[in-house]
């Protein structure tokens, strides 16, 4: 079993830059980091694993179904825009209680973090954009196959396209993680955290921030 630690749910606000003391500027991503509310504490004795379930933000009551409404009411927590879980070590469970809040104090400037988000959806795309295929000749007798993928396989034997063949299809909107991003600045008053570099997804998308698993 790996080493688990508490994480944080934020929302990507956009990108900016920060000037260092020596005059250099570095690109940063700003993440809106309002307090996470603990909804449930899962234990290995009852649930088979140890985890902290949290929510963040708010949601109109008409958008909360009955099972979710009962779940939030049991915890006496305002309904948020979703539910997320973070696996933790059993020894960490005592640090949290249902209804309590998790803030930015779990992170520090200079710390390395892993960030997970949903990439931008690109819809249905061809092989050139989706898999970086090379285009066919623009002229020299080519009039129909400028962006064609090329051969899909053999003939009667094996008589099929092998699984995993790179073809056109839906691109983006998948879960992606970026590892070892440095925390550059934490603004507790504005509920913002700035990390070095880019993170997956569009502005406004939810992201999960965890302590780096590999350093």
Curated annotation (Swiss-Prot):
UniProt keyword annotation of Ribonucleoprotein present: yes
Modified how: Methylated by PrmB.
InterPro entries xref list? Ribosomal_uL3, Ribosomal_uL3_bac/org-type, Ribosomal_uL3_CS, Transl_B-barrel_sf
* Keyword tags: Methylation, Ribonucleoprotein, Ribosomal protein, RNA-binding, rRNA-binding
Please verify whether the record's keywords include Ribonucleoprotein.
yes
Enumerate the Gene Ontology biological process terms: translation
Pfam family for this entry, one: Ribosomal_L3
User: Which molecular function terms from Gene Ontology are attached?
Assistant: rRNA binding; structural constituent of ribosome
Q: Which GO terms describe its cellular component?
A: cytosolic large ribosomal subunit
- N5-methylglutamine-modified residues are 156
Q: What HAMAP family does the database record attribute to this sequence?
A: Ribosomal_uL3_B
Question: How does the annotation summarize its subunit structure?
Answer: Part of the 50S ribosomal subunit. Forms a cluster with proteins L14 and L19.
What does the similarity note say?
Belongs to the universal ribosomal protein uL3 family.
Query: So what does this one do?
Result: One of the primary rRNA binding proteins, it binds directly near the 3'-end of the 23S rRNA, where it nucleates assembly of the 50S subunit.
What is this protein called in UniProt? Answer: Large ribosomal subunit protein uL3
| Native source organism of the sequence | Xylella fastidiosa (strain M12)
């Amino acid at each position: 079993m790996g080493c688990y630690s508490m994480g944080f749910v934020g929302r990507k606000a956009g990108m900016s830059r920060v000037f260092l003391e020596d005059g250099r500027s570095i690109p940063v991503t700003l993440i809106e980091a309002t307090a996470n509310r603990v909804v449930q504490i899962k234990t290995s004795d009852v649930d088979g694993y140890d985890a902290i379930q949290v929510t963040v933000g708010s949601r109109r009551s008409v958008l909360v179904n009955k099972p979710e409404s009962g779940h939030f009411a049991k915890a006496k927590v305002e309904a948020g825009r979703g539910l997320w879980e973070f696996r933790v070590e059993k020894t960490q469970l005592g640090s949290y209680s249902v209804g309590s809040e998790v803030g930015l104090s779990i992170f520090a400037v200079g710390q390395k973090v892993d960030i997970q988000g949903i990439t931008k959806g690109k819809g249905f795309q061809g092989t050139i954009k989706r898999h970086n295929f090379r285009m066919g000749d623009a002229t020299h007798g080519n009039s129909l196959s400028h962006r064609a993928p090329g051969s899909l396989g053999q003939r009667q034997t094996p008589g099929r396209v092998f699984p995993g063949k790179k073809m056109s299809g839906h691109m983006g909107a998948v879960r992606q993680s970026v590892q070892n991003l440095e925390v550059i600045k934490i603004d507790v008053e504005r509920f913002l955290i700035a990390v070095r570099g880019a993170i997956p997804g569009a502005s406004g998308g939810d992201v999960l921030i965890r302590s780096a698993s590999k350093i």
